[in-house]
């Protein structure tokens, strides 16, 4: 278990890249999709990740890639779904195809970092940042703010000062959703006020060239359409209100279909229309 606070559901198969690209093209043409985030798990464990990124790039989409980044340094173990190892992925190739590469940093020491992200060391994360900077990547550091690292935000900010390639620091309030995030919620829950205090510390201590992006739990409701490796399209099951409610903390999701379904775009259109209807 690599991340006991993870919100995600992990597919047990991998959808073929041409199918993913057809779906992405459909989202672009029908709904005006402009940006896509490729995440996981860790997308670098996908055998044809560079081919997938090139296909998305050729569609004219803005690509954000979120990865632990270990495979940039050498062969890396597969820690999410599956076993074995993945070969080293060339940072230069990924940087050339990605508009922004997000690397997690959830603490300034291994003791803090590994409360949330078990197998990533600070040394390895800093090595990944250095490698991406040399590759000319635009880098974003992602920090999940939880009860175990609120006192470490200033120290994390100090680590960022050594990298001019970091353009953004995203701070995410821990969300108690998904199979793991909900199960382990008591270990990580943080109030809105404590989150905003952590954001203020980040703004006060971050290097001047780094933009701070604060992502509260309530602010992320109903903002994402998620797709797992098997092609299942889903959203978290949450109340319609824009603020966070206690019932939003659950391990349920709303399954919409699969990217291979012939009517998947129609289903998404129906959901979009239902969400925009205003009662008389």
Regions found by a protein language model. Name each.
Residues 1-19, 30-31:
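Canonical Radical SAM [4Fe-4S] cluster-binding loop centered on the CxxxCxxC motif
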Residues 2, 40, 68, 229-231:
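Residue-level recognition of short loop/turn positions
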Residues 10-24, 41-98, 105-112, 119-124, ...:
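Canonical radical SAM enzyme core domain
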Residues 23-33:
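Catalytic domains of carbohydrate-active enzymes, especially glycoside hydrolases
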Residues 15, 114-115, 119-126, 130-229, ...:
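Radical SAM enzyme [4Fe-4S]-AdoMet core and its adjacent flexible, acidic
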Residues 2, 32, 97, 164-168:
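Short loop/turn motifs at secondary-structure junctions
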Residues 35-37, 62-64, 100-102, 138-142, ...:
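Structural preference for beta-strand elements that scaffold enzyme active sites
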